[in-house]
């Protein structure tokens, strides 16, 4: 498990004027777990990946982490489907069933969630006991209408956290028949509007963007594009490009302020663990 410690300076003002102890959040993050129900082949030549990951092992790890940090947050950045015979045979039901045991605070939609079409996506997503966020797809008029949420607010350890999600352009990634009627919206514009609303109108102390845009993607509208065209985002939990970040990356927003970004390769070989101190 990777581990980061970073400090976010936010205006958590005490009305009494008395100094308060810093608030702390523990955040776990996975991305692109790709139906890896069991750990990766132990005979794999790449010893960094061999016999690691897997949905079942992650359930056990999360239970252990919650014993140490009962208030932890856990987010996933999409593409939890596609990559094993379990998905081919059961079309996502196995993955959703196991994710229901993980206490997910939210996930989002990756391009592979479209692989069996909107009807299957709607059917399986209705079985989820966790929020599935997507802010820049408009599902109006499709079977997916009303199933996802554009954003949520979580209150944890005295901190008000706004969470939203941005997903990739479907052209070139998703078959036209599998996303018919879905409208894609510019992630930079949507991120700016949503993060500003969460910070200024909803008065969130922290704003997290769950992203499946990718890091250094050759498609243009990636995490860097989204960050530099927005403000009010404190943390980006990324996915899609299977980028392994041994340390957090940073990219400046439209005001020149660095935004923290995490991504963890694929198959939950690594789980990002962030300890956030809010002053």
Language-model segments: what does each one mean?
Residues 1-2, 182:
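Intrinsically disordered, low-complexity segments enriched in small/polar residues
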Residues 2-8:
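Sec-dependent signal peptide recognition
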Residues 8-9, 64:
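A periodicity- and composition-biased signal for non-globular, repetitive helical segments
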Residues 9-17:
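Hydrophobic h-region of N-terminal signal peptides that target proteins for export
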Residues 19-279:
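Acidic, metal/ion-coordinating pockets
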């Amino acid at each position: 498990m990777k581990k980061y410690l970073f400090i976010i300076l936010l205006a958590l003002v005490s009305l009494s004027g008395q100094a308060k102890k810093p608030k702390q959040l523990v955040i776990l993050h996975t991305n692109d777990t790709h139906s890896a129900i069991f750990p990766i082949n132990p005979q794999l030549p790449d010893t960094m990946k061999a016999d690691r990951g897997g949905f079942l092992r992650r359930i056990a790890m999360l239970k252990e982490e919650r014993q140490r940090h009962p208030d932890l947050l856990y987010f996933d950045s999409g593409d939890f489907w596609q990559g094993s015979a379990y998905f081919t045979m059961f079309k996502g039901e196995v993955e959703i069933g196991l994710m229901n045991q993980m206490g997910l605070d939210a996930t989002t939609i990756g391009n592979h969630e479209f692989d069996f079409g909107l009807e299957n996506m709607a059917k399986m997503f209705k079985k989820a006991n966790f929020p599935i966020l997507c802010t820049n797809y408009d599902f109006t008029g499709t079977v997916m209408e009303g199933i996802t949420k554009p954003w949520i607010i979580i209150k944890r350890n005295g901190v008000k956290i706004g969470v939203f999600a941005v997903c990739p352009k479907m052209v070139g990634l998703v078959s036209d028949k599998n996303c018919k009627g879905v409208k894609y919206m510019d992630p930079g514009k949507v991120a700016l509007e949503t993060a500003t609303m969460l910070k200024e109108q909803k008065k969130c102390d922290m704003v997290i963007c769950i992203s499946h845009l990718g890091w250094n993607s050759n498609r243009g509208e990636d995490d860097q594009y989204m960050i530099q065209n927005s403000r009010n985002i404190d943390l980006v939990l990324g996915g899609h490009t299977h980028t392994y970040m041994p340390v957090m990356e940073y990219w400046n927003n439209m005001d020149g302020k660095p935004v923290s970004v995490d991504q963890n390769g694929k198959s939950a070989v690594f789980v990002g663990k962030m300890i956030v101190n809010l002053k």
